[in-house]
């Protein structure tokens, strides 16, 4: 009688096979190894890309867009005999940036409005503004000057 035919053991599914191949079992091989602190470079996961910060922020010309007035005439309103002409824009087109530099906004203090950005640097050297005088609201007829 011939010896029984040796068959190959059934293969493990691919995920388990990969785990078995990559994870060393040094005890089975007869030697003890401590696991590596860092896997080699090819097995390391790549870092996600970091959002790039701009060294110089964008200038207002790149950020701001011109404010266009709404176009009043549309091609559907035109009569068939009338020749279509380019729409007449009567409003002045301004960039927001230009409008802001012409006149300071209302909410800025008067010091900044009068002296510009240098006023903020000189603000600590100037005397404190006096509180509004209450006697000016009710001027008496006999006194010409206010006590404050």
From Swiss-Prot:
Ranges for region Disordered: 1-86, 122-148
Compositional bias annotation for Low complexity: 1-17
Residue ranges, compositional bias (Polar residues): 137-148
Record flagged with keyword tRNA processing: no
TM region(s), chain numbering: none
Keyword Electron transport: no
Annotated Pfam families: DUF5451
Coiled-coil ranges from the UniProt annotation: none
Keywords of the record: Early protein
Residue ranges with Basic residues bias: 38-57
Family per similarity comment: Belongs to the Epstein-Barr virus BLLF2 family.
Protein name: Uncharacterized protein BLLF2
């Amino acid at each position: 009688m011939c010896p029984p035919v040796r068959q190959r053991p059934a293969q493990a599914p691919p995920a388990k096979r990969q785990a078995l191949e990559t994870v060393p079992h040094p005890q089975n091989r007869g030697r003890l190894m401590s696991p590596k602190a860092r896997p080699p470079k090819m097995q390391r996961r790549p870092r996600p890309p970091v959002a790039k910060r701009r060294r110089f922020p964008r200038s207002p010309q790149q950020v701001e867009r011109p404010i266009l007035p709404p176009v009043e005439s549309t091609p559907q309103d035109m009569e068939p005999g009338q020749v279509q002409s380019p729409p007449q824009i009567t409003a002045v087109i301004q960039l927001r940036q230009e409008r802001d530099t012409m006149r300071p906004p209302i909410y800025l203090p008067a010091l900044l409005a009068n002296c510009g950005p240098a006023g903020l640097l000189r603000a600590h050297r100037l005397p404190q503004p006096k509180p509004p005088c209450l006697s000016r609201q009710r001027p008496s007829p006999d006194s010409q000057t206010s006590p404050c």
